[in-house]
Amino acid sequence: MDKDAIHHRQATPGPGGGFRREEVEEKLISLFTGEAGIARDRLDLTAPISGYGLDSVSVASILAEAETWAGRRIDPDLLWKQPSIRALADHLSAPPSAEAPKPAAVGEGYDSLTGLLEFEARFRALDEAGLEDPFFRTFDGPSGATIVSQGRSLVNFASYNYLGLAGHEEVKRAVRDAVDRYGASVSASRLSSGEREIHGRLESVLARFVGAEEALVFVGGHATNVSVIGHLCSPQDLIVYDSLMHNSAVTGARLSGARCLAFPHNDTEALDALLNRERRNHRSALVLVEGVYSTEGDLPDLKELVRLKRKHEAWLMVDEAHSIGVLGRTGRGIAEHFAVPASEIDILMGTLSKSLASCGGYVAGARRLIRYLRYTCPGFIFSAGISPANTAAALRAIEIVEAEPSRVEDLRVNAATFARMALASGLDIGRSAHSGVVPVIVGGDMQAMRLSNELFAAGINVQPLVSPAVEPGRARLRFFLSSLHTDEHLGQAVRLTADRVFARPALGR
């Protein structure tokens, strides 16, 4: 069978008005091998497609193309069950229902949104399992080692206030002073009349802190990745990213129009092979990794990544959202941790919302690149400047980190202590190492949500992380550690978690 023909033409109608199953399966195989760059011998046609190491955006893109090609939608309830290629082929080749579809009534047009239907299917499953929604709970007060909800104090492991600065008195004082001087908002793009002296000070301090020539601050971390990556790359370029890369970076990559390929998590041999195959066909190549992976709590091999980017003449961009203020003896991030000059990383991206007690994002790098972004990046020039309050909070937080590096060491000790206690209790913490993120892997999505609810009732605030953010069967409770946690907090959390994990058989989805 001519695979190119299969790839580009509509499926052939089969008996009963459906599509030939063999053609549908071959089309799905071609999408996962061609569009996603997965070797054919890696495809187990009976395994869940979410187990191929692709991010959720890539999977959604492939399935959308399959729907367009087959001329029919995939049932959201099937997607919720994490289907295999074979199950998808059976579904798309089955004869359509004999019942003619009813015209959508006014106000019911949202039924055409597959994502909305899948979302609603998830909540139906939650209701059927008798589980309370663990998300969007309301809290009061600062996010410290403890937090208050409805008048009840809980030990808090659901906030990435790594260095305990979000409620620091000096940070709050700096915020008040900035609002008194500059107001609540700069009320304009910085390109026009929104620039304030404090913006330049923060960018200078940030650049010095991470070891770059210059830095540029955006209003949000997600928007930073989307805008910068989407702006720098184009259809002539190649973007390769770790399969666990954050949604913001993957979204920016997709919006750029570049050829986008994921490589298996932290597999530098696979990255090398991918670049060997693809690099020559593109004007430039961008490699995207995270300094600390927020789902796993593990690190990339920076030295090997630098070697590969030199070998293949590629750019290297590191998202330091969870590594700035965490890695390195003084919290300067992944370059300090690996003793690699920061200049070896072409684009250092980070957020202000975690260790730096604020809200916003930044990129740092060569002066020439940052100046170009300052004048041309849409997410910067067409957005209001970061608020004076957030600017002042981040600026004062960096000054405190520089003056008190012991906070970084306190975080490191707490994370190592928690990991050691968890392992001693028989809990599965996956690949977590050297970071402030320690997952406890518990199995099915429903198990993770049930455990989160039970721990909340017992006085521990920890959020579940479920598919498609993680592989099916590897849902987890994600513990964010802080320099403020005490040994008592850590011991209590591990004991209560282990008691509940081992109190019943693992639940399914």
Explain the meaning of each model-derived region.
Residues 261, 265-318:
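Active-site phosphate-binding strand-loop segment of PLP-dependent enzymes
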Residues 228-247:
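Conserved PLP-anchoring active-site segment centered on the Schiff-base-forming lysine
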Residues 173, 177-220, 415:
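Conserved N-terminal alpha-helix of the aminotransferase class I/II PLP-enzyme fold
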Residues 312-315, 322, 327-434:
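Active-site C-terminal subdomain of aminotransferase-like
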Residues 114-184, 314:
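N-terminal "arm"/small-domain region of PLP-dependent enzymes with the aminotransferase-like
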Residues 173-177, 181, 204, 208, ...:
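PLP-dependent enzyme catalytic core of the Aspartate aminotransferase-like
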